[in-house]
A protein has these predicted regions:
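A short beta-strand motif characteristic of beta-propeller blades
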Residues: 26-32, 73-78, 119-124, 165-171, ...
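Blade-loop segments of beta-propeller domains
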Residues: 29-93
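Structural signal for beta-propeller blades
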Residues: 13-14, 57-60, 104-106, 150-152, ...
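Short loop/turn segments immediately following beta-strands, especially the blade-tip
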Residues: 17-23, 63-70, 109-116, 155-163, ...
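Beta-rich, blade/repeat-based domains predominating
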Residues: 34-45, 80-94, 124-139, 172-189, ...
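Short loop/turn segments immediately following the C-termini of beta-strands
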Residues: 9, 54-55, 101-102, 111, ...
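Loop-centered beta-sheet repeat module
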Residues: 142-199
Length: 330
């Protein structure tokens, strides 16, 4: 059965949830990891989950993952150089990339069966407030949205050694604050969510050259909202037909339809969510969207219409304190 994992920063645990035969999501177990668990990343190649703890000291927790029952067991915990806001594993499963907004850095960590040595970590500290990292579909590049630079840095990635080399930079609008991005499943378009003005950029991706070209900009906030923008997360459906974003100030999800030929987006709807949605996820079969309310300590469950992309609220489930990350696994 598919499982859902929610990291809870203040209660220091990860909630493991599972879909029941009734179609309702239920809590099945809780894994205590200590104060400050944040971003979660699941290895595509092994039975392991990695969680960045954002406290003193900052650390990376490695958990053994039971894909059948969803249970988690601690394997090791190792120090990190900084407070991390995003984790990604490359498509070979050999390297983990950790992003630190506060320390302006990227850390590349080789993944081994045993605990990696800290001396094997490569740290780059030439960026201004990077917030995420995404590997290109062919694993040749890493794209890093940098809120402080108002741009997306593109690094060449040597998957044999885990080495990053600055390749180029795409410049966003001043004050937009690039935060999170995701590729369209076909690989030729990229969707970039900007935190500070809550806009969404559609970019064309040249896989051969490793370059970006701007195509479109849209507003993700509901009409009439006058608060300060604070966009957080973005995901695209597996079929590439719909893009979803969230904003913490308005506590809403925005739904967009993607043009199959050009990748351009058309706004469809805004949906109210739990208070301050910092993270959300589409489940593995695309039937649900799960939204973590960072200030409500609840997970909102929405049923997703695969044909229209629209969402219907179906369930509210208690989490630990201050849920900041949600992810799904088959």
């Amino acid at each position: 059965m598919p499982h859902v994992y929610v990291s809870n920063a203040l209660s220091g645990d990860i909630h493991v949830m599972q879909w029941a035969d009734t179609g309702r999501l239920t809590l099945t177990s809780t894994c205590v990891v200590g104060a400050g668990p944040g971003p979660i990343c699941i290895s595509p190649m092994t039975e392991r989950m990695y969680v960045a703890k954002r406290g003193e000291p900052n650390s990376l927790v490695c958990l053994q993952l039971d894909r059948t029952h969803g249970q988690l067991n601690l394997l090791y915990e190792m120090p990190l150089t900084a407070r991390m806001c995003n984790l990604r594993i490359d498509r070979t499963g050999r390297f983990l990339l950790a992003v630190s907004y506060h320390s302006h850095s990227l850390t590349v960590c080789p993944l081994t069966p045993a605990q990696p040595a800290a001396s094997n970590h490569t740290v780059m500290s030439t960026l201004r407030h990077p917030h995420a990292a995404v590997f290109s579909p062919d694993n040749r590049f890493v794209l890093v949205p940098c809120l402080g630079d108002d741009g997306v840095m593109v690094f060449g990635f040597d998957e044999s050694r885990g080495q990053l080399t600055l390749h180029t930079q795409w410049q966003a609008r001043a004050g937009s604050g690039p935060r999170h991005l995701c590729f369209h499943p076909e690989g030729q378009w990229l969707y970039l969510l900007n935190e500070l003005d809550a806009t969404l950029d559609v970019l064309a991706w040249d896989a051969a050259q490793g370059t970006l070209q701007h195509m479109q900009t849209l507003n993700t906030l509901p009409s009439g909202f006058t608060g300060k923008p604070w966009a957080a997360d973005i995901h695209v459906s597996a079929d590439g037909q719909f893009v979803y974003t969230c904003d913490r100030s308005s506590s809403t999800l925005a739904v967009f339809k993607a043009d199959a030929q050009r990748g351009a987006l058309t706004w469809l709807a805004h949906v109210p969510t739990e208070l301050q949605p910092r993270s959300f996820a589409l489940d593995v079969d695309g039937r649900h969207v799960l939204v973590a309310g960072q200030k409500s300590n609840h997970l909102g469950v929405f049923e997703r219409d695969a044909q229209t992309g629209l969402l219907t609220f179906t369930q509210r489930l208690a989490t630990g304190e201050e849920p900041g990350w949600v992810t799904c696994l088959a």
